[in-house]
Structure formats: structure tokens, C-alpha cells
């Protein structure tokens, strides 16, 4: 019996390029081979290098998790579904750009989900609740009070009128 529930968790693009990797076994070089195989394979669960490999295809992104052969497969499948729901809750639209934009939150989500290959949280809402909230993402996400926005608009308008003289 192996202590690990999970040997590795990968976030890859549809070509198999790894965007994020968290490996808990000594065989780290296998991660790239697993990502490449999962990108070319259409199955959601398979066996590769004596490991159970589970893959979720989300638009341009693949979530890949691999475990030892003697792991409780239904348990890993269920917590992987929950992790996938939490992942989608963070990135909203699973594209390569969104993964890079939300990379810090993905790292924190994986840390909440797994500790040294052992599943720590099996519910997506619990994982999301424990993540720190971002105040905003750039100027687009900033909440500006209505009165201040009106004042700023009037000030900009009056300054632009004054500069044309």
C-alpha cells in the first residue's frame, strides 16, 4: 500500500505543454510524458507507466492527475471532480491566458487540495472558501463609487476643455 493518494497533478494546454506541475514522487520526469499522452488520448481515465491517469478536458486546458495503481480509484475520481469544479470556479473560462492570469490562485488551490500527495480537502466549496479573495485584478476590476466616478468624469472633462484654449 502506498501512502500517496496522488503522485502528481498537472495543468497542461491541449498540446500537452505543462502550465503548472505539482509532483509528489521521485519520478518527476514522467510528468511530461503523462501530459503528452493525455493530450493525444481521448479517454478520461487510462493506465500509463503503471499509474492510473485521470484527465479532464476543459476547453483549451487539461487537468491531469495520476496515482499509484493500488489507490482507491473511486475516491480519487470523486475528489478530482471536486477539484475540477473549484478550478473552474477560479478561472471561469479555462484558457491558457486565464491560467496564467490566475496562476497564484491555482497554486493556492492545489496547496489546499493536496499536501505531499495526500488529499486534504474533498469539497470544491470548502477549497474555494479557504482561498484569499483578491481585491481586484487591474483597473478593470476595481470598484469605483458612483459619486467618485461622476466627479472624476467631470474633472477630466473640465481639464480637457481648459487645455484646448
UniProtKB/Swiss-Prot annotation:
InterPro entries, alphabetized: Longin-like_dom_sf (IPR011012)
Record localization: Cytoplasm; Golgi apparatus membrane; Cytoplasmic vesicle, COPI-coated vesicle membrane
Question: Could you list the residue ranges forming a coiled coil in this record?
Answer: none
Query: What coarse category fits the chief subcellular location reported for this protein?
Result: cytoplasm
Q: How does it sit in the membrane?
A: Peripheral membrane protein
Gene3D superfamilies attached here? 3.30.450.60
Q: Which UniProt keywords apply?
A: Cytoplasm, Cytoplasmic vesicle, ER-Golgi transport, Golgi apparatus, Membrane, Protein transport, Transport
SUPFAM superfamilies documented for this protein: SNARE-like
Any Gene Ontology CC annotation = COPI-coated vesicle membrane
Q: Name one GO biological process term.
A: protein transport
Q: How does it associate, per the subunit comment?
A: Oligomeric complex that consists of at least the alpha, beta, beta', gamma, delta, epsilon and zeta subunits.
UniProt function note: The coatomer is a cytosolic protein complex that binds to dilysine motifs and reversibly associates with Golgi non-clathrin-coated vesicles, which further mediate biosynthetic protein transport from the ER, via the Golgi up to the trans Golgi network. Coatomer complex is required for budding from Golgi membranes, and is essential for the retrograde Golgi-to-ER transport of dilysine-tagged proteins. The zeta subunit may be involved in regulating the coat assembly and, hence, the rate of biosynthetic protein transport due to its association-dissociation properties with the coatomer complex.
Q: What's the family?
A: Belongs to the adaptor complexes small subunit family.
Question: What's the protein called, per UniProt?
Answer: Coatomer subunit zeta
Organism (species)? Encephalitozoon cuniculi (strain GB-M1) (Microsporidian parasite)
Amino acid at each position: 500500500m502506498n501512502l500517496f493518494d496522488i503522485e502528481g497533478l498537472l495543468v497542461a494546454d491541449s498540446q500537452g505543454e505543462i502550465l503548472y506541475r505539482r509532483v509528489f514522487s521521485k519520478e518527476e520526469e514522467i510528468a511530461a510524458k503523462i501530459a503528452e499522452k493525455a493530450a493525444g488520448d481521448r479517454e478520461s481515465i487510462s493506465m500509463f507507466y503503471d499509474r492510473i491517469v485521470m484527465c479532464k478536458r476543459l476547453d483549451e486546458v487539461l487537468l491531469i492527475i495520476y496515482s499509484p495503481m493500488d489507490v482507491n480509484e473511486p475516491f480519487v475520481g470523486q475528489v478530482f471532480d471536486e477539484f475540477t469544479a473549484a478550478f473552474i470556479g477560479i478561472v471561469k473560462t479555462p484558457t491558457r491566458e486565464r491560467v496564467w492570469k490566475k496562476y497564484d490562485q491555482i497554486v493556492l488551490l492545489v496547496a489546499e487540495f493536496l499536501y505531499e500527495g495526500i488529499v486534504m480537502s474533498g469539497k470544491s466549496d470548502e477549497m474555494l472558501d479557504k482561498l484569499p479573495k483578491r481585491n481586484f485584478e487591474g483597473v478593470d476590476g476595481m470598484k469605483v463609487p458612483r459619486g467618485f466616478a461622476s466627479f472624476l468624469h467631470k474633472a477630466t472633462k473640465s481639464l480637457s476643455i481648459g487645455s484646448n484654449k
